[in-house]
Amino acid sequence: MFARAVLKLLAAVLALECTGCVLHLQRDLEPPPGFHYEPPPGATQPFDSFERTPVELSQPFDETRNHEIMRFEFRSSGRNGHPDNLVEGQYFRSKAPGKKSLVVVMPIWGTSSYPPAKISTGYARRAGDDTHVMWIYGNAPVFPWTELSSVPTEEGFRALAQDSAERYRSAVVDMRRLVDWATMQPEIDASRIAFVGFSMSALVTATLLANEPRVSAGVLMMGAARFSEIFSRCRNRAGEVREHVLRTFGWTPSEYHDFFESLFAPADPVRFEGRYDPNRILMIDAMFDDCMPESARAALWEITGHPQRVTFLYQHRSAFYSLTPLGLNVSRRKIYRFLDKVLGRDAAAGD
């Protein structure tokens, strides 16, 4: 009996250790002193102007009980890295009549499609016919890390980095164009449009929220502010780029920081303090993030007025396990509940 009890205790301890990725802190605090929110009157340069563009929808290629599933595409406003300069994705369009809310799920460009696929299909299933979902594909990277970390000349590096800044600008403007199209569709409730961003697309979503007043809410998972700090301190692929530039071209860390500050300051959330409604934002980050510095994550939280913030006790990539059964789907459930709340689905939502 005693031996069996000890084995059960050991099993329980091991189970707890194996679910470390779901250990997290949650903050629900008042806005910082002096914080004042005013809805953004419009977009600022270089995100302020664009031409309306049609979004082309395919015939449905699949369906669920509540949604038709079709592909969509439209031409990018700039150079977005796609071979044909297109924005592509899937549209889970509700079969029910009447105006429904819209959730746009952003990609992790050039890397894993699991997080956006999981949230897109999962929330469409959860919301039923009360919500449309659009999943943006991310096959073309905003930052071509392999090329950036191996380009042989300083001139070539500067050109690639400037092209990446243009891809970022295009991503923000293209999502503004998508929102513009969505507000004119008879099946979409223009007052209930939310975005979900992960890592790099969390940065884009943060810029978008400050420049597109028709986006009513956003999820920022593994994002931050102070973009030049991210480039200066992120490890992973971005760290390989930094090491290459400092070693090959003889740049100092300060020169590297200032170069990316000049490129990305127009998009940085620090520029848009007061344009974020903390009641309409969910921030998810990782305490031991090895890409987004703690100071940059704290800055985003301050600038956005102390929105609901969930901090997982993990590093950058491993925090995404919280979207999976390995992480007990903790962040997935938190995202769903947040969307239910801001889109007015509380009464009808399950877990």
Regions found by a protein language model. Give the residues of each.
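N-terminal cap/lid segment of alpha/beta-hydrolase-fold proteins
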Residues: 50-96
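Short beta-strand element of the alpha/beta-hydrolase
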Residues: 88-89, 99-108
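Cap/lid segment of the alpha/beta-hydrolase catalytic domain
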Residues: 111-173
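Gly/Ser-rich "nucleophile elbow"/oxyanion-hole loop immediately N-terminal to the catalytic nucleophile
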Residues: 157-199
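Hydrolase active-site cap/lid region
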Residues: 207-255, 311
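Short beta-strand/loop motif that positions the catalytic acidic residue
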Residues: 276-277, 282-285
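C-terminal catalytic histidine-bearing segment of alpha/beta-hydrolase fold enzymes
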Residues: 298-351
